[in-house]
Amino acid sequence: KKYNYNIQVGDVITGIIFSKEKQGYLVDIGTPIAAYLPKEEISIFIQKQTDIEVNLAQEFFILAQDLQKNTIILSTKRLLYIRSWTRIRQLNTEDIVIQAKITGINKGGLLVELENIQGFIPKSHLCYITKVDTLLNTTIMCKCLIANEQSNQLILSNRAAVLEKYLHKLKVGTIVDSTVIALKSYGAFVSIYNIPALLHISEIEVNKTNNFIIGQIIAVQIIHIDIKQGRLSVSRRYLKK
């Protein structure tokens, strides 16, 4: 029995794939005409299957319809996209630490996948990692920085996640041991729990960095914590000689 549903573009509807065509699939959604699921609108998860299961009920997104031409176009890719962004918005709102899969590495940072959406961790938001190339296809802890569904922009921070993990040990005024990881004209970068921290030249007791060497362990005092950006600033000016 067929039902004359009053369907609209943007609706989510249950249907059953009943026939494989050259460029897609025919789907029974209870309307007098069969709906069509083009191959390019099939979600990534289903594409990974060698054969799409027929006669299995599942949900579809109404992508387009033209009743004069008797066509209803469906999408599972769009449905997955909408639901993925709903979960990402929730993760962003709750500001929780999450695990993302690393899918690519470039000079600017890491490409990751979170809830089937591609995201990016800029190099400036990565903790100190010596062998970045070994990270491909592993997971990395991070927090959302920018989550914009309209522009499909997902920017994440590994530093912010690691900083939150060790926040109970890192307070303004705390003196900790750190490792020198880079020397710059404006100061030095040190690693604290693998979180890069800036030791500005004005915060060094003799206003110069040439008495430091890479790998040296030095005591520093935390003077600023930016939890959202995952940044630390440290000083040696107030340490007892």
Predicted regions and their residues:
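Single-stranded RNA-binding regions, centering on S1/OB-family and related RNA-binding modules
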Residues: K1-K241
